Amino acid sequence: MIDFSKTITDFRSHVPGIRDWAYFETGSTGLVPDFVYEGVRRYMDDRYYKGGDSLWAYEDETVSTLFMHQRSKEALAEMVHCKPSEIAFGLSSTQLFTLVTEGIDYAEDDNIVTVRKGWIGSRFAWQKREAEGLEIRYVEPEDGRMTAERIAARCDEHTRAVSVNLVESNTGYRLDMDALGRFCAEKNILLYVDGVQALGALEVNVEKWNVDFLVGNDYKWMMNFCGTGYAYMSPKVQKRIRHWGAGWMSDKDRFNTAKDRLDLRADAGRFEIGHQHNDGIYGLGLVAMQNNLLGLSNIESYVCGLADYFCGRVEETEGIRLSYDFPRKNRCQIVVVKLEKSLQVSEKDFEEAKVCAPIGSLDENGEREMRISLHYYNNREDIDRFFAVLKKGV
C-alpha cells in the first residue's frame, strides 16, 4: 500500500514539487513525497468521514495509533543506530532540546561548552540558562570551521556537557563527530547534538559517536509537514532528566483510565506526556523507512556527489565563488556561495526559470550569499538549470 522507491534515481518521481522546479531550499523547508501526502490524507479522510481513531496503513498491515508510534520509532532507531526505546517524539527539535537545558540539574561550578554562532534554537536555550547563572563557554568558529580540537580546548574538569550542531545551518560545515565523540567519552562529558541539518541526508550513528542526546525535526531533510520533533536519549541521559511533567502517555499502561497512581514508563516515551501530532509521527516513520530501504550510506554518497558537482560548476563560472573552503571530511550536502557584485542576476530571474534558490541581502562589499541545499530528489540537471540562470547575468 505504501509505494516506496527502490532506487535513489527513481525517488524523484515520488516528489511532485520537483517535476517543474529545480528546488534548492531543503535546508529551510523540504518537499513532501507522494507516499507521505497520500498516507496522511487517508488518515485525515477517515477521521473526517468516519471519526474515531482510524488506522494507519503500511505495506504489510494496518495498525492503530500507538502501534504506528512504535513502528515509527523502530524506523528512526534503525536510521540513527539506537534502540526504539531510546526515541521520543515532541513538538519540535527545539522543544525537545530543552529536556537537557531545563531538565538536568547542573551544579554551581558546572559549565557547558557550545558554539558561538551555531543555530539559534539550541543557542538561545543555553542563553536562557546562562542568564540564570549557568556558565556557558562559547567556542568561536574560524573561517566557518569548528573543529573537535577547538571545542576540547574550552573544556575542563567542570565541563558537564558539550552542545553542538552536526551540520552548521549557515555554513554547511560538518563536524568531525568521531573525534569529538571520543574526547567526550574519555572525559566523561555528555554530548548533545542538534542533527536537524544532517538527519535524512547523511549517515548518523549515535552509538559509534558516543552521543548522549540527539534531536531532529520533520520538515527539512525528513520531507514532512511542520510540527513534529524527535529525540534520541541515551539511558544515561534518561536517568538524569528531571521529569517536570507527566500525563497519560507517560504511564506504563496508557489506556488504563481506572488507575489511581502514575507508574512512569521505563523508556524515553515517558517524556511524551500527552497525545502527539500523529500525522507527523506517521510521516516521519515513512521517510525513515524509505531512507533505510535506500541506505543512508548510499544517500550520503549521492547528495555529497551532487555537492561536489555543484562546486565544480562554481569553479568554472564567472561571478560566483564558494564562501568557505572546507576539507572534504567537513563538507556535506549544503553549499554556501557568494554572488559577486558584477553578477547581474535576481531572484526574479531564478523564479522565471523555475529555480527555487533564494538570494541573501547585499553585504558591505555589494555581494550576496546563497545557501544551496541538495537532497536526493535533486539531480545534476537541476544544478545545470541553476548555472544557466547565472550565465545570463555574467
Locations of regions flagged by a protein language model:
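Pyridoxal 5′-phosphate
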Residues: 1-394
